[in-house]
Amino acid sequence: MTARGGRAPLARRAVVYGAVGLAAIAGVAMWSGAGRHGGTGASGEPPDASAARGPAAAPPQAAVPASTSLPPSLAGSSAPRLPLDAGGHLAKARAVRDFFDYCLTAQSDLSAAGLDAFVMREIAAQLDGTVAQAEALDVWHRYRAYLDALAKLRDAGAVDKSDLGALQLALDQRASIAYRWLGDWSQPFFGAEQWRQRYDLARLKIAQDPALTDAQKAERLAALEQQMPADERAAQQRVDRQRAAIDQIAQLQKSGATPDAMRAQLTQTLGPEAAARVAQMQQDDASWQRRYADYAAQRAQIESAGLSPQDRDAQIAALRQRVFTKPGEAVRAASLDRGAGSAR
């Protein structure tokens, strides 16, 4: 995140959330955060890249009501719904990992034991008294073991992205660890993104092979693309359009285009509905920045009032809830607060 409210560049968010509506661009860049727990999915992807896609992804489901007592980092949010199969058992779907990754967002607020207790409560809130409750707890403990194993890797599993051999070894190692601890859950948790990582790595190997001419590289890349499943190929085409739209929005912002001019340009390439959503996002973004600045000023007054840490945190949490009333806003503000605290 960047300064001034810590927001991601509007160009990217406008496309991801407003214009094209895709999962964010996947690729080998995901390796830069390998092995981290907090703030990312377990694969080390950025938050906006951890959206499920591919055959292992479960369709979106409504969230369940938030627990009565949520950690500060999750205040105002609701846990994703745990999916069940026709027999009432926990469904082997990516949505289960999404639920656990949601819970892991709170690990900066909780001890290891506290995090386990929180996950148990969140599972019970949905599955209390069912066979799926014990199944979900078992998968949680296995997932924690997987994360702990990743954390024990050298440099937490991070590798030099320019070293394709190291990338290949890291991918194989992470897949092995996932299967060792998660067994048949490793496929719904990581199968789609592991496939994508291997595909992207194969593309890099071709592109960087000094023994190939440009024509040979193009031929091999085209052949590799033909091996891609139809749904992945369609997703890649959408990603390509997303990249082009991101570049266009960034150029318009850089040139100082007015909102009306930007909307007119985007209408030509993205269509009127998408252009209208980008314009609305600009307005929402400006409103957010004003409200966050006002909130930050009030938060600073609380921080300088000489309160005990417990009273200070309680007053700041209450302030967040008063100022940020829309779903997810309080969570976003808390995340920005933590980032600001780390920078100080």
From Swiss-Prot:
Location(s) in or outside the cell: Cell inner membrane
Keywords: Cell inner membrane, Cell membrane, Chaperone, Lipid degradation, Lipid metabolism, Membrane, Transmembrane, Transmembrane helix
Record's signal peptide: none
GO cellular component, one term: plasma membrane
InterPro entries per UniProt: Lipase_chaperone (IPR004961)
Pfam families attached to this UniProt entry: Lipase_chap
Region (Disordered): 37-78
Low complexity compositional bias, start-end: 43-78
GO biological process: lipid catabolic process; protein folding
Membrane association type: Single-pass membrane protein
Alphabetized GO MF terms: unfolded protein binding
Major site of localization recorded for this protein: membrane
Membrane-spanning parts: 14-34
Family (UniProt): Belongs to the lipase chaperone family.
Free-text function comment from the UniProt entry: May be involved in the folding of the extracellular lipase during its passage through the periplasm.
Record-given protein name: Lipase chaperone
Record lineage: Bacteria, Pseudomonadati, Pseudomonadota, Betaproteobacteria, Burkholderiales
